[in-house]
A protein has these predicted regions:
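C-terminal motif of bacterial Sec signal peptides marking the signal peptidase cleavage site
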Residues: 4-7
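Surface-exposed amphipathic alpha-helical segments
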Residues: 193-218
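A short, structured loop/turn motif at beta-sheet edges
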Residues: 118-123, 154-161, 186
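Short, well-ordered beta-strand elements
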Residues: 111-114, 183-196
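Short, surface-exposed coil-to-beta transition loops
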Residues: 109-112, 174-180
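Short Gly/Thr-rich strand-loop-strand
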Residues: 61-64, 129-178, 217
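N-terminal "mature-domain start" segment
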Residues: 9, 15-99
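A short acidic-to-branched-hydrophobic micro-motif
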Residues: 91-128
Length: 218
């Protein structure tokens, strides 16, 4: 007679010995000063962002500008131009690079792009949030040398980008206005000013590309 022999192994479900999976979030390192020049857009990229041709660098700086004595009131300095020393005073920034560009002697387009280095992402964030509170305090301003008057036509925040449009009063045809954009990425602030008869969102496009350049650096 045949004998049925039962196996000695358990007939229950075996316990898994596989360790649970974990997801690690990589935190980008702070950028350093030598990486700043590579964050700025080329003239060709600025051309594309502004819808023009022949943009060329007319000024390249390794420090912030000071035009505080050419306009009033002071609370509008951040809206009037990019990379202003008084705007960044006491912010804890470490270094800056900027390019100014236009498309010739009788230029119809102007751009300034600045990148400002902070020691940590937290200090860059603090400056950005302070700017988000300060920018709305400006409504109108004037250039004291030329006597031109300007007003803020638009001002909005989209995540980590501040954007504004300022318009010169009585500029004559076809008009003159400037786009402003401030972008936060890691420990870098990108600060952009673009001016033309119709700046649109050209400053935002340049700022977004600066942000992408920051994100590409690890």
């Amino acid at each position: 007679m045949g004998v049925l022999v039962a196996g000695c192994g358990s007939t229950g479900h075996a316990e898994s010995t596989t360790a649970p999976s974990t997801t690690k979030t990589l935190i980008p390192r702070p950028l350093v000063e030598r990486e700043l020049p590579g964050l700025l857009l080329s003239p060709e990229q600025v051309n594309a962002a502004m819808g023009t041709t022949d943009m060329a660098i007319i000024s390249s700086q390794t420090s912030l500008s000071d035009h505080s004595n050419t306009m009033a009131p002071p609370e509008c300095l951040a809206l009037d131009g990019a990379g202003e020393a008084d705007v960044y005073a006491d912010s804890g920034y470490r270094a800056a690079r900027d390019h100014s560009l236009n498309n010739g002697d009788n230029f119809t387009h102007y751009a300034k792009q600045a990148v400002v280095l902070f020691p940590l992402a937290e200090t860059a964030r603090a400056f950005f949030e302070a700017s988000a509170e300060q920018w709305p305090a400006c409504h109108e301003y004037r250039h004291t040398q030329s006597g031109t008057k300007w007003y803020v036509a638009e001002l909005t925040r989209d995540g980590d980008i501040l954007k504004a449009i300022t318009v010169q009063r009585d500029a004559g045809h076809p008009g003159w206005g400037c786009g402003r954009a401030l972008v936060l990425r890691n420990n870098i602030i990108g600060d952009v000013n673009t001016c033309s008869a119709d700046p649109g969102d050209s400053a935002v496009r340049i700022a977004q590309q600066i942000g992408e350049n920051v994100d590409a650096v690890w």
